[in-house]
Amino acid sequence: MSNLENLTSKIIEDANKEAEKLLSEAKKEENEIVDEKVKKANKAKEQIIEKTKREAKTKAERVISNTHLKVRNNKLEAKQEMINKVFDEAVIKLQNLPQEEYLNFIKNSILSLDIEGDEEIIVSPNDKNKIDISFILTLNNKLKAKGKKDLLKISNENRNIKGGFILYKNGIEINNSFEALVDSLRDELEQEIIEALFS
């Protein structure tokens, strides 16, 4: 009986050792699996954090860039408004020329043009009363003295211009309105005005 008990005891002891060994290996494998999952989770967390940081940085850079662009555009807009104001004021000063200076301007401008002398002078409704028949006669005499026709006349047509004149003949116009004259000088003078205003 003692042999049987010894054998049974040995079998139970071996079974317990085998069970402990299996439990130990299972526990070790469980720990390895848990460690691997934790490592993967930490790596994923770091990647998410890094991606979020990059996206936040990109978004911040975009916001800063857009803000700089808006500020630059606002500055350019303000500068352009000031430049436009300078040219608008030039037109206003020309509009406010005394009568004699205004008529001299028209006379000298017309005499400096390469015209035949039989054109029509178109002016604004406000300037129609400034140009009388004696002015036209004087102008025609000067044209005749230059070897041109002396048939210049005031047109019955008015134009919505801010001063100056438009010469018209056979569908062709020479625009010497104050706005056109100031605009023609704009490209030439704009850089000088920018330097004077903003440097």
Swiss-Prot record:
GO terms for biological process: proton motive force-driven plasma membrane ATP synthesis. Gene3D superfamilies: ATP synthase, E subunit, C-terminal, F1F0 ATP synthase subunit B, membrane domain. It comes from the Bacteria. It holds the Pfam family vATP-synt_E. GO terms for cellular component: proton-transporting two-sector ATPase complex, catalytic domain. Keywords: ATP synthesis, Hydrogen ion transport, Ion transport, Transport. The keyword Cell wall biogenesis/degradation does not apply. InterPro entries: ATP_synth_B-like_membr_sf, ATPase_E_C, ATPase_V1_Esu. GO terms for molecular function: ATP binding; proton-transporting ATP synthase activity, rotational mechanism; proton-transporting ATPase activity, rotational mechanism. HAMAP family: ATP_synth_E_arch (MF_00311). Produces ATP from ADP in the presence of a proton gradient across the membrane. Belongs to the V-ATPase E subunit family. This is V-type ATP synthase subunit E. It comes from Clostridium botulinum (strain Langeland / NCTC 10281 / Type F). The gene is atpE.
